[in-house]
């Protein structure tokens, strides 16, 4: 019997959890820490957090629901990992081995890389050699050309 797995992909834009239609219009869904608590209760098998922000520094200008104002994606992942009872995959703007190391030290279990694989394909091998192939994931963006 095939086991079904629940693996939500959460998009973070400027420190907020968002929903997107074609990466054009974004609807704010709230605090990423609150979401991970809820998904832990729902027994998600894994979480994927993707940073789609324009900047590396966030200024959300308030403390939401008693959670401190996190200023970087790394701080958010560090905070979220305290409440996650499942593996966390992190992706977005990861172009250096040092950044992978920082995320792994701050609670990430796996790293998703995307754009750098087109610019520097050997980065996948370098990352797998340094951190192990079990924690490096390559994600691929695609677009249908026939309009569907």
Model-derived regions, located:
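Catalytic domains of carbohydrate-active enzymes, especially glycoside hydrolases
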Residues: 34-50
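Hydrophobic faces of well-ordered beta-strands that scaffold small-molecule active sites
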Residues: 4-10, 19, 47-49, 88-92, ...
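Catalytic cores of alpha/beta
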Residues: 75, 79-111
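Generic structural signal for hydrophobic
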Residues: 38-42, 80, 103, 127
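Alpha-helix-loop-beta-strand connector modules within alpha/beta enzyme cores
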Residues: 58-89, 125-142
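Active-site mouth loops of central-metabolism enzymes
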Residues: 12-35, 87-94, 143-148
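Conserved anion-binding
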Residues: 12-18, 104-148
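Short glycine-enriched, charge-decorated loop/helix-capping segments at active-site entrances
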Residues: 21-27, 54-57, 62-67, 148
């Amino acid at each position: 019997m095939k086991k079904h797995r629940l693996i939500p992909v959460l998009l973070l834009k400027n420190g907020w959890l968002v929903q997107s239609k074609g990466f054009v219009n974004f609807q704010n869904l709230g605090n990423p820490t609150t979401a991970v608590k809820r998904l832990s209760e729902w027994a998600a098998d894994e979480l994927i957090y993707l940073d789609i922000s324009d900047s590396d520094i966030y200024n959300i200008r308030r403390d939401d629901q008693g959670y401190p104002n996190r200023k970087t994606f790394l701080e958010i992942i560090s905070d979220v990992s305290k409440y996650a009872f499942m593996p966390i995959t992190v992706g977005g703007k990861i172009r250096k081995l040092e950044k992978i190391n920082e995320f792994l030290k701050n609670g990430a279990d796996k790293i998703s890389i995307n754009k750098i694989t087109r610019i520097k394909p050997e980065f996948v091998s370098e990352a797998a050699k340094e951190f192990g192939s079990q924690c490096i994931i390559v994600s691929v963006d695609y677009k249908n050309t026939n309009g569907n």
